[in-house]
Amino acid sequence: MAKVQVNNVVVLDNPSPFYNPFQFEITFECIEDLSEDLEWKIIYVGSAESEEYDQVLDSVLVGPVPAGRHMFVFQADAPNPGLIPDADAVGVTVVLITCTYRGQEFIRVGYYVNNEYTETELRENPPVKPDFSKLQRNILASNPRVTRFHINWEDNTEKLEDAESSNPNLPSLLSTDALPSASKGWSTSENSLNVMLESHMDCM
């Protein structure tokens, strides 16, 4: 049984200019005291073609964590544009929030991110070299992809099989036909994971 349940993730400052920090308000609950820290990460997928372009925007240790409900705002700087392939700068990518305990990842929340120019002229005639200062980042906050993993929470070395789901296939995730058209923009009326995904995020 999982000792930590993520109850809610709220995407803050969305949409925003590309260079603005990512901000997520995370609410989670521990069913008992944790003797070691939780490690949270924000990872930006620079390209679906290769993991070498993934950027860990920030990593923070939270703990020791007592039993009960906790909330914090996780903020991370924007990705380094110099590490993003020019062909992948504009369009749809993914940002991931992960949490590990004793080096074991037990939850991953992925959001589609659409980077596009706000000026009509630039959208119709984009520059060969991306101008990141003109890009707007829009996170599809109402449709996260949640993946949970069984881990060993106890003070022993017993290995547990991953029984919930495997790591998300990012190329598949990015090629989904369900994505809204970038030209139409995305609705930002819902910026919260909230308990609408409770059936997918219940405690293991």
From Swiss-Prot:
<dbReference type="GO" id="GO:0006335">
    <property type="term" value="P:DNA replication-dependent chromatin assembly"/>
</dbReference>
<dbReference type="GO" id="GO:0000785">
    <property type="term" value="C:chromatin"/>
</dbReference>
<keyword id="KW-0143">Chaperone</keyword>
<keyword id="KW-0805">Transcription regulation</keyword>
<feature type="short sequence motif" description="Required for interaction with HIRA">
    <location>
        <begin position="31"/>
        <end position="37"/>
    </location>
</feature>
<keyword id="KW-0597">Phosphoprotein</keyword>
<dbReference type="GO" id="GO:0042393">
    <property type="term" value="F:histone binding"/>
</dbReference>
<dbReference type="GO" id="GO:0140713">
    <property type="term" value="F:histone chaperone activity"/>
</dbReference>
<feature type="region of interest" description="Interaction with histone H3, CHAF1B, and HIRA">
    <location>
        <begin position="1"/>
        <end position="156"/>
    </location>
</feature>
<dbReference type="GO" id="GO:0003682">
    <property type="term" value="F:chromatin binding"/>
</dbReference>
<dbReference type="InterPro" id="IPR036747">
    <property type="entry name" value="ASF1-like_sf"/>
</dbReference>
<comment type="subunit">
    <text>Interacts with histone H3 (via C-terminus), including histone H3.1, H3.2 and H3.3, and histone H4; the interaction with H3 is direct. Probably interacts with the heterodimeric form of H3-H4 taking the place of the second dimer. Interacts with the CHAF1A, CHAF1B and RBBP4 subunits of the CAF-1 complex. Interacts with CABIN1, HAT1, HIRA, NASP, TAF1 and UBN1. Found in a soluble complex with NASP and histones H3 and H4; the interaction with NASP is probably indirect and mediated by H3-H4. Interacts with CDAN1. Found in a cytosolic complex with IPO4 and histones H3 and H4. Interacts with CREBBP.</text>
</comment>
<dbReference type="GO" id="GO:0140861">
    <property type="term" value="P:DNA repair-dependent chromatin remodeling"/>
</dbReference>
<dbReference type="Pfam" id="PF04729">
    <property type="entry name" value="ASF1_hist_chap"/>
</dbReference>
<dbReference type="GO" id="GO:0042692">
    <property type="term" value="P:muscle cell differentiation"/>
</dbReference>
<protein>
    <recommendedName>
        <fullName>Histone chaperone ASF1A</fullName>
    </recommendedName>
</protein>
<keyword id="KW-0804">Transcription</keyword>
<dbReference type="GO" id="GO:0006334">
    <property type="term" value="P:nucleosome assembly"/>
</dbReference>
<keyword id="KW-0539">Nucleus</keyword>
<dbReference type="GO" id="GO:0031297">
    <property type="term" value="P:replication fork processing"/>
</dbReference>
<feature type="region of interest" description="Required for interaction with HIRA">
    <location>
        <begin position="155"/>
        <end position="204"/>
    </location>
</feature>
<dbReference type="GO" id="GO:0035861">
    <property type="term" value="C:site of double-strand break"/>
</dbReference>
<dbReference type="GO" id="GO:0005634">
    <property type="term" value="C:nucleus"/>
</dbReference>
<dbReference type="GO" id="GO:0006281">
    <property type="term" value="P:DNA repair"/>
</dbReference>
<dbReference type="GO" id="GO:0005654">
    <property type="term" value="C:nucleoplasm"/>
</dbReference>
<dbReference type="GO" id="GO:0032991">
    <property type="term" value="C:protein-containing complex"/>
</dbReference>
<keyword id="KW-0156">Chromatin regulator</keyword>
<comment type="similarity">
    <text>Belongs to the ASF1 family.</text>
</comment>
<dbReference type="GO" id="GO:0001649">
    <property type="term" value="P:osteoblast differentiation"/>
</dbReference>
<comment type="function">
    <text>Histone chaperone that facilitates histone deposition and histone exchange and removal during nucleosome assembly and disassembly. Cooperates with chromatin assembly factor 1 (CAF-1) to promote replication-dependent chromatin assembly and with HIRA to promote replication-independent chromatin assembly. Promotes homologous recombination-mediated repair of double-strand breaks (DSBs) at stalled or collapsed replication forks: acts by mediating histone replacement at DSBs, leading to recruitment of the MMS22L-TONSL complex and subsequent loading of RAD51.</text>
</comment>
<feature type="modified residue" description="Phosphoserine; by TLK2">
    <location>
        <position position="192"/>
    </location>
</feature>
<dbReference type="InterPro" id="IPR006818">
    <property type="entry name" value="ASF1-like"/>
</dbReference>
